[in-house]
């Protein structure tokens, strides 16, 4: 696979799930905390699954806009939203894996148009391409 890189970013984490993470440019810094469900104290802070969910949701809206801009005959509504729900748990093959639901809200679009846009975006979105074949991702138009 070949990618013509247009943008790169660098982030560093220290302390694992109970540490901190920040980007090299200083634009983003976050305190991390392990959820109770994963054996942590569930204290103040975010976890990798939350960060992944936020990133995937934002990226998927961008993918829908890119598809629409290519002349798909539809426009992504200004109030469109994507709700990404990311679960984590043990895999039957060993190790841990993710399980993802993307609920796409496209007010004002006909259901068939919305579903077609979401399906096309799923083939454009970098997160979708990174997870394809490795993670169960369910798409729903709400």
Q: Residue locations for each model-derived region?
A:
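Extended beta-strand/beta-hairpin segments
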Residues: 1-54, 61-142
């Amino acid at each position: 696979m070949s990618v013509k890189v247009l943008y790169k970013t660098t982030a560093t984490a220290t302390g694992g799930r109970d540490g901190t993470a920040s980007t090299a440019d200083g634009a983003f810094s976050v305190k991390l905390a392990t959820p109770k469900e994963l054996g942590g104290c569930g204290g103040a802070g975010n976890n990798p699954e939350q960060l992944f969910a936020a990133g995937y949701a934002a990226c998927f809206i961008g993918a829908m806009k890119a598809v629409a801009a290519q002349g798909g005959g539809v426009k992504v509504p200004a109030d469109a939203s994507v709700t990404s729900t990311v679960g984590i748990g043990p895999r039957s093959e060993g190790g841990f894996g993710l399980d993802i639901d993307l609920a796409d809200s496209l007010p004002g679009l006909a259901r068939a148009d919305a579903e077609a846009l979401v399906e096309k975006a799923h083939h454009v979105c970098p997160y979708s391409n990174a997870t394809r074949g490795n993670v169960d991702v369910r798409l729903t138009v709400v």
